[in-house]
Amino acid sequence: MYKRQEAAQTEADVVDGGLRYDLTLPLSRYYANNSANLSAPFKALQVGSVWRADRPQKGRFRQFVQCDIDILGDATNLAEIEEILALTKALKRICPDKAYTVRVNDRAILKGMADYSGFPENETDKVFIILDKMDKIGLDGVREELLAEGYAPEAVEKYTGLLAEIQNDAAGVRALGEKLSGVMDPAKAENLATIMETVKAVADIEFG
């Protein structure tokens, strides 16, 4: 540990003092170094503390516990289905008398929505960061932040219009895929719809 006014000269000076940002990167490093000796697909369940160096925003924490379920080496829908079912099984045991909603998304579909709305391709990551706040600030808040970032009002209205009309079921996902067919392969939406239908057939859950 460094005392006040002491400064590290190189990265090596503080390499032993780092705090874990998330559980994903260490797992990726472990898998890359040991994949030849691991079962395929490789399944991992991790629970541990992670930290944020930046100043936390309201409602967020500098330190919190993260739980990750990962399946590596399986590119089929089975991995996604198994992970969602594992989550629902855990939630039912933790909260047996409480209803819950599982939220799923697909980055390819989110990108298709951004492209359809007319956002510049190199700006989609920034759009996603704002979209990620929707649970906290609502759809109107997302609209306001996008406009504050200087995006074209036409693109913002088109994008928030899509978000407002999405139906959170397999049929709604397929309908969205057809609407985005000019900028995205509808098969991407069909893939997510199939996952939702399969999970719904096994576990009685609601998607949000």
Give each language-model segment a name:
Residues P26, A86, I109-M113, K126, ...:
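A general alpha-helix detector
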Residues M1-Q5:
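Conserved small/polar residues in nucleotide/adenosyl-binding loops
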Residues E121-L131, V142-E145:
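A charged helix-plus-loop insertion that forms the helical arch/lid used to bind
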Residues K98-A108, V127, E206-G208:
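Short, surface-exposed recognition loops or helix-turn segments adjacent to catalytic cores
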Residues A7-V14, D22-D97, R143-G208:
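Positively charged, Gly/Ser-enriched RNA/tRNA-binding surfaces
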Residues R103-S117, D132-G138:
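Short, conserved secondary-structure transition motifs
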